[in-house]
Amino acid sequence: MSKQQKILFIDRDGTLIVEPPVDFQVDRLDKLKLEPFVIPSLLSLQDAGYRLVMVTNQDGLGTDSYPQEDFDAPHNMMMEIFESQGVKFDDVLICPHFEKDNCSCRKPKLGLVKEYLQAGKVDFQNSFVIGDRQTDLQLAENMAIRGIQYNPEIMGWKRILKDLTVKARVAEVVRTTKETDIKVFVNLDEQGGNAISTGLGFFDHMLDQIATHGGFQMVCKVEGDLHIDDHHTVEDTALALGQALKEALGDKRGIGRFGFSLPMDECLAQCALDLSGRPYLKFDAQFSREQVGDLSTEMVVHFFRSLTDTLACTLHLSSAGNNDHHIIESLFKAFGRTLRQAIKVEGTELPSSKGVL
């Protein structure tokens, strides 16, 4: 196992399999029962990049009160079921002692997981202990990672899967220079509630087109040196927006990555987008006026160039028509509609054969 892996340290009885309420021992095959949705959830968690390690206390295992052979039959059957369905545990760590034995390996002590901690195998920000008991949460605290208390009613495997794989795709970027003071917030999984104020009415409208057609929420407040011109305001807003979108996308796991759009009004706007991690812009649009509203038409291409720089995307964008207002609006709409396709979550895989975007 390479260093710094996302690892789930998972309890067995009461978390992976049902714990018998009378004697708390799964010592016969007829007592073996999987917790609801555990297999599809573990498969999806594996697909999301998590490694699985089982960590379990088995009181008195190997003694007369809990003979090894009584444990082995249902345990081996459980492992065979998991393996047959594609669920792979990197390790199965078992403490066989009673609490009174005061051993160093019984949860919540660190003996069982000591090797993982000392070898630097654990990604502390993205690893978890999952178990049904307070001792599991205490183990997580002792390991300096987060704990999830399993409960089939309120925190079952479906909920755990959602919490660990569907992360909030939000970001806020504050950018302050001598020319501008900008705050941009985006939420890629919410729509509506856009609040955009740049001091340029037409530019506000264009940014709203990106968010509305992109299917995400944008809050953008800009104070710039408009007494000079609109250059710094437009450029720095684009840089901040691109950075916010990039941060909200995270590692881009599961997204569509690509988008294509050809909307038709009296203008033909074409847009192709690849969230490739590499900035490149090919822009083709001609304007007959110096301004539309309070926005300089020369700043349209500059906006998209600055945006591609911080978003780190490949963008081909063009529009042709007779009305500059409609041409510009079609560019922003087409980009928003294309971005909607590219940021949509379609699965859990990283959309790159290189393993990174």
UniProtKB/Swiss-Prot annotation:
Is Secreted found in the keyword set? no
The cofactors it requires, by name, are: Mg(2+); Zn(2+)
Binding-site positions, Mg(2+): 11, 13, 132
Q: What EC number(s) does the entry state?
A: 3.1.3.15, 4.2.1.19
GO BP annotations of the record are: L-histidine biosynthetic process
Gene Ontology molecular function, alphabetical: histidinol-phosphatase activity; imidazoleglycerol-phosphate dehydratase activity; metal ion binding
Name the Pfam families on file. Answer: IGPD, PNK3P
Q: Which residues form the active site?
A: 11, 13
Keywords, A to Z? Amino-acid biosynthesis, Cytoplasm, Histidine biosynthesis, Hydrolase, Lyase, Magnesium, Metal-binding, Multifunctional enzyme, Zinc
Q: What is its main location?
A: cytoplasm
Biological pathway? Amino-acid biosynthesis; L-histidine biosynthesis; L-histidine from 5-phospho-alpha-D-ribose 1-diphosphate: step 6/9; Amino-acid biosynthesis; L-histidine biosynthesis; L-histidine from 5-phospho-alpha-D-ribose 1-diphosphate: step 8/9
User: Which sequence ranges are marked TM in the entry?
Assistant: none
User: Where is this protein localized, as stated in its record?
Assistant: Cytoplasm
Q: Which InterPro entries match?
A: HAD-like_sf, HAD-SF_hydro_IIIA, HAD_sf, His_synth_bifunc_HisB, HisB_N, Histidinol-phos, IGPD_sf, ImidazoleglycerolP_deHydtase
In this chain, Zn(2+) is annotated as bound at 95, 97, 103, 105
Using the record for this protein, list the coiled-coil segments as residue ranges, or answer none: none
Alphabetical GO CC annotations of the entry are:
cytoplasm
Where is region (Imidazoleglycerol-phosphate dehydratase) located?
A: 169-357
The answer to whether the entry has keyword DNA-binding is no
Q: Where is this region: Histidinol-phosphatase?
A: 1-168
Q: Which reaction does it catalyse?
A: D-erythro-1-(imidazol-4-yl)glycerol 3-phosphate = 3-(imidazol-4-yl)-2-oxopropyl phosphate + H2O; L-histidinol phosphate + H2O = L-histidinol + phosphate
Q: Which family is it part of?
A: In the N-terminal section; belongs to the histidinol-phosphatase family. In the C-terminal section; belongs to the imidazoleglycerol-phosphate dehydratase family.
Q: NCBIfam families recorded for this chain? A: HAD-SF-IIIA, hisB_Nterm, Histidinol-ppas, PRK00951.2-1, PRK00951.2-4, PRK05446.1
Q: What is the name of this protein?
A: Histidine biosynthesis bifunctional protein HisB
List the lineage, top down: Bacteria, Pseudomonadati, Pseudomonadota, Gammaproteobacteria, Vibrionales
